[in-house]
Amino acid sequence: MKLKKIIPAFPLLSTVAVGLWLTPTQASADAADTMVDISGKKVLVGYWHNWASKGRDGYKQGTSASLNLSEVNQAYNVVPVSFMKSDGTTRIPTFKPYNQTDTAFRQEVAQLNSQGRAVLLALGGADAHIQLVKGDEQAFANEIIRQVETYGFDGLDIDLEQLAITAGDNQTVIPATLKIVKDHYRAQGKNFIITMAPEFPYLKPGAAYETYITSLNGYYDYIAPQLYNQGGDGVWVDEIMTWVAQSNDALKYEFLYYMSDSLIHGTRGYLQIPNDKLVLGLPANRDAAGSGYVVEATPVAKTFDQLAKDGNPIRGLMTWSANWDVGQDVNGKSYNNEFATRYSNLVK
């Protein structure tokens, strides 16, 4: 299949040059040509694994499912593909489908796009060390655009963790790169989606994600804090005179509500994320994360309801991951789309 546009082999010279050097071909259009616009829409976000399950890969020795992208539960209207990272031959992160040709994978993306579902490229992940340096902006922008034109991605999710968040010049290079890409597609009347999924302790003033958020203000579409795998970290709440920890199942509603309220207003020691750009990140089940799983659906539904009553309805929910949502526990019992089934009604 021919691509929508041809990306030159030589570096583009400026932000303006991006539009000038890309020459349209006469390729027949497919649904992957459509850049799905999620502006103003509620989202249920489910990450997709770009690798085969090896079995017993869960925190409780369960097994994640191996899925084609097109097999992701249709309740997930935003599907980040995990992950874009360095292939070891260059600093510039890249992506390749693990089990399909470029043409076949593009057809998978096209199927989701035809259903009005956005497919993002997730940058990083827990085991990816990305270290860009000043001057990489244009080369990285070129690669992202090449990925979009090759596979039909609708945007990019910043999913940097650990040392990769601040490595090299990432905090300045990545936002500058994404502005180039977003402006390039804006010139075509399209919305290149930019999202982030930081672990929530990095959302404090002076913490590692502050630069990304402030630099991309006006450019990002939503932020989905990972409210899991952080043990006893949490938030002090004066109103109830209690430290509310992420790992405290007895106070799960209080954690979800007050963490959301803190982020919406930029209080209790956290940065501000507008309510219409806030997506809560939760694990699909106990195998998907070491802590943070919500045992019953009630605390999540109650949080959504109370925030709406406060006049601060939030954007939606995110989970790690769509593959885990249809995985199995250690005894071989299917998780049977528990997350999608429980929460899809909250984003309608």
Curated annotation (Swiss-Prot):
**Quick one: where is this thing mainly located?**
secreted
Q: Which GO terms describe its biological process?
A: chitin catabolic process; polysaccharide catabolic process
Please give the coiled-coil regions recorded for this protein. none
Q: What is its EC number?
A: 3.2.1.14
One GO term of the cellular component aspect?
Answer: extracellular region
**Which Pfam families has this protein been placed in?**
Glyco_hydro_18 (PF00704)
Q: What class of enzyme is it?
A: hydrolase
Family matches, as SMART domains: Glyco_18 (SM00636)
Compartments, record wording:
Secreted
Which segment of the chain is annotated as a signal peptide?
1-29
Q: Which UniProt keywords apply?
A: Carbohydrate metabolism, Chitin degradation, Glycosidase, Hydrolase, Polysaccharide degradation, Secreted, Signal
GO molecular function annotation:
chitin binding; chitinase activity; endochitinase activity
Under catalytic activity, the entry for this protein gives: Random endo-hydrolysis of N-acetyl-beta-D-glucosaminide (1->4)-beta-linkages in chitin and chitodextrins
Active-site annotation: E161 (proton donor)
Chain ranges of the GH18 domain: 42-348
> Which pathway is recorded for this entry?
Glycan degradation; chitin degradation
Similarity field: Belongs to the glycosyl hydrolase 18 family.
Job description of the protein: Involved in chitin degradation. Catalyzes the cleavage of glycosidic linkages in chitooligosaccharides and in alpha- and beta-chitin. Its activity on chitooligosaccharides increases considerably with degrees of polymerization (the initial rate of hydrolysis for GlcNAc5 is about 130-fold higher than that for GlcNAc3).
Q: What is the protein name given in its UniProt record?
A: Chitinase
Supply the source organism for this entry.
Enterococcus faecalis (strain ATCC 700802 / V583)
